[in-house]
Swiss-Prot record:
Organism: Eremothecium gossypii (strain ATCC 10895 / CBS 109.51 / FGSC 9923 / NRRL Y-1056)
Family: Belongs to the WD repeat IPI3/WDR18 family.
Oligomeric form and interacting partners: Component of the RIX1 complex, composed of IPI1, RIX1/IPI2 and IPI3 in a 1:2:2 stoichiometry. The complex interacts (via RIX1) with MDN1 (via its hexameric AAA ATPase ring) and the pre-60S ribosome particles.
Pfam families for this protein: WD40
The keyword Nucleus is assigned to this record: yes
Gene3D superfamilies to which the protein is assigned, alphabetical: YVTN repeat-like/Quinoprotein amine dehydrogenase (2.130.10.10)
Repeat keyword on record: yes
Protein name as it appears in the record: Pre-rRNA-processing protein IPI3
Length: 518
């Protein structure tokens, strides 16, 4: 098991792995705005800088293609992309919800396409007053969260965006005073209704945590964390144990279950429901001993610093053991979460002296490393099938919703079913069992002279028969038992043959009755 890392800058796009050395550079890839690249299956969609164009690449680990596959023209330049995926695992949770491609412009306009057909479903002209910085679908695609440079965070219903002419937001949060740069949603949530935690970071140097619930009229603000620097990114541990916050001068690790002593015997939950707490973050300094309990009484928290450079984006590995920090110099640093030490650096392969700028997008996903085996031909066939799939051209005019609308999306394929043997029907299975029984019945009795005594207890080993008379008696008893079992097996085989003959006779009579009735 490995993790694939895809990161882009203003002049490059790189596909690599965390635990291996393979690397590929995507050609003609230029994404200068954050969150302007998304994955749609094995296809990578990148909104090009200063162009009304989306480049499509294949990032399948089996194909390893670097060339551009498709170009999708757009009505205007897009600065942010997101997708709403199909989730068919849970019955009753939007099983027919198609892939939706969301795109936003620097002016705050929101586009919603149906990726299966390319139809433009909705254009929200003033979704935000300024550029949208990030979009994400949550709760199995039921809701879409958008954050903008206008310091607002809006939660939309996906059905409202698709069906209504003028969709209205479900919630609007405007507690920040400057642009919201990033947000993260808790991994511990129910897949059927809105019940989760939302973390937002802003240039006003604060992190705010909200409790999202369908039973509340408005999201409840649980805690506010103030930092000494403007914040650029945020990531959440898979188990919701720690927040990783990025700034222009480094990244901080904020544990949500705060230790008041070095032994960890006393823990405090920083996100207590019903209380709005305000905490100030104090950077931890090496070699300086402080009283964490005294700082906590004053509303201050001690946080460790992971890296001392400009951090534009943060991603956490699948198991939470590593953190990927995208830097302002165009590379990614892999940091161990326990020791807070860098273990690897991922950099694009460019000519010396090339100015890459900060990393604008970073995407991680788990992948299975398969060695050469009997399934190699199957993997090659799947890779060719993936390459053959093309994303349809995106429409520039809004689709007319008055008539019927056929929903088109790619159905999932089960690769294991193609290699598993075909299930046997009952008559064939019974014939196979009868044949095996006849083989065992006609096999002569074989006596082995090997005695296994190593697995017996010492007391049982001493109780073994010593005289030859007792050994002969034991062998006779064994022969009698084998003869009895053989006789029982023959009786069962005969009964099975009689039952099968009766079944065939009744089946023939049934067929005759059907023919006469016609």
């Amino acid at each position: 098991m490995d993790e694939q890392v895809i990161f882009t800058t203003a002049v490059s796009g790189t596909v690599c792995q965390v635990h291996s050395v393979g690397q590929a550079n995507l050609r003609q890839c230029a994404a200068s705005t954050p969150n302007s690249a998304v994955l749609m299956g094995d296809k990578l969609l990148v909104a090009q800088a200063n162009k009304a164009l989306i480049n499509v690449y294949s990032v399948d680990s089996r194909s390893k293609k670097e060339a551009l596959e498709q170009r999708l023209p757009l009505p205007e330049q897009l600065s942010c992309l997101a997708v709403v995926e199909n989730h068919t695992g849970d019955a009753g949770v939007h099983q027919q919800l198609p892939y939706l491609l969301l795109g936003s412009t620097p002016s705050g306009k929101l586009y919603v396409w149906e990726a299966g057909s390319g139809k433009l479903l909705t254009v929200k002209a003033m979704a935000h007053y300024q550029a949208i910085t990030k979009m994400q679908a949550i709760i199995n695609g039921k809701y879409v969260v958008t954050a903008g440079a206008d310091s607002r965070l809006i939660i939309w219903q996906t059905a409202s965006l698709v069906l209504e002419e003028e969709p209205k937001p479900l919630y609007v949060l405007h507690d920040h005073t400057l642009a919201i740069t990033d947000f993260a949603v808790s991994n511990a949530h129910n897949g059927k209704y809105l019940n989760s935690k939302l973390y937002t970071v802003s240039e006003d140097m604060t992190v705010r945590c909200y409790q999202l619930s369908s039973q509340l009229e408005q999201p409840q603000l649980l805690a506010t964390f103030t930092f000494p620097l403007a914040l650029t990114s945020i990531a959440l541990d898979p188990a919701d144990r720690c927040l990783y916050v990025g700034t222009r001068e480094g990244a901080f690790a904020l544990p949500l279950f705060y230790k008041l002593d070095s032994s960890g015997a006393t823990l405090v939950n920083l996100l207590q429901p019903g209380k709005h707490q305000i905490y100030s973050i104090v950077p931890e300094q090496a070699g300086v001993e402080v009283n964490k309990q005294e700082l906590y009484r004053m509303g201050q928290l001690l946080c460790s610093k992971m890296l001392s450079c400009h951090v534009s984006l943060i991603r956490v590995s699948m198991d939470g053991s590593m953190v990927l920090l995208a830097t302002g110099s165009g590379n990614c640093v892999v940091v161990d979460t326990y020791s807070k030490q860098p273990v690897k650096e991922l950099a694009p392969l460019l000519a010396p002296g090339t100015q890459t700028g900060p990393v604008s997008n970073i995407i991680t996903r788990s992948m299975t490393v398969k060695s050469d085996s009997l399934l190699q031909d199957l993997n090659l066939a799947d890779a060719r099938a993936t390459e053959a799939i093309k994303i349809p051209a995106l429409a520039k005019t809004v689709f007319d919703k008055t008539g019927t609308h056929d929903i088109i999306y790619c159905a999932p394929t089960d690769t294991l079913s193609s290699v598993l043997p075909r299930a046997l029907d009952l008559p064939q299975y019974l014939d196979m069992i009868a044949e095996e029984d006849s083989v065992f019945a006609n096999t002569p009795v074989t006596r082995s002279t090997v005695k296994v005594v190593g697995e017996l207890a010492p007391a049982k080993a001493e109780a073994l028969p010593a005289s030859s008379a007792e050994a002969q008696q034991s062998a006779d008893d064994t022969d009698a038992e084998v003869a009895r079992l053989r006789e029982s097996l023959q009786q069962l085989t005969g009964a099975y043959k009689d039952l099968r003959a009766l079944h065939e006779k009744l089946y023939e009579e049934h067929e005759k009755l059907l023919q006469t009735s016609k």
